[in-house]
Amino acid sequence: DATFVPYSIFRDVQRGSSLPWHKDYTRPALLDFFLPARDSHAAAYYDWGTEKETQWKENYRLWMAFVNEYKNRGGRVTAGADSGYMYNLYGFGYIQELELLREAGFHPMEVIQSATLNAAEAIGMNDLIGTIEVGKLADMILMDQNPLKNLKYLYGTGDIKLNETNEVVRVGGVNYTIKDGIIYDARQLLEDVKKIVDEEKEATPNWESLMIQSIDR
């Protein structure tokens, strides 16, 4: 489990703190927790700049090369996000991790395998989950786009592109999640999260300043 995503913000703090989903899906309390702090390991970017980001980019180059070579030599790599700090948001952070595996040199199918079969094998449950086969649990996601073409389609908010009439449209996103035989409307679940965040915003008068502090650093 390479878990690239938690420290990836150190490569570009301004970008990581202003990712588009934070406005709608990150609770104010979590935004406050994400702000720079001298006494917090999870918010150590209180004096950050180009030199440190350049060092971290080189660190990631070496780290990714190692993980990719480990995979190429037969090592099993799984995907994990360790979300909850440094602007690494639950759900969204996991898809960021898949994109980082792709950046490391994994083929898109190897990325998907890291998140499915490899993970199931690592915990000794590949007889029940990890692949779609007769007799296995039907734990899966359903979507109308191909993530092998663009892993960003796996984000709850999908991705944007120009359509045939030159209009900007949003495509992708998971439509349904099936877990333990229960079908969940993934888009409705995401809307439920937004409502929870909106309710906390109403009870947090300074939430906009937290968002501004996240972006204007």
Q: What is each model feature region?
A:
Residues 111, 127-130, 139-144, 153, ...:
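C-terminal or late-domain output modules
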Residues 1-104, 197-217:
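Active-site neighborhoods of metal-dependent hydrolases
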Residues 48-49, 109-110, 155-156:
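Short, positively charged
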Residues 79, 85-142, 171:
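Extended hydrophobic/aromatic segments used for targeting, binding, or gating
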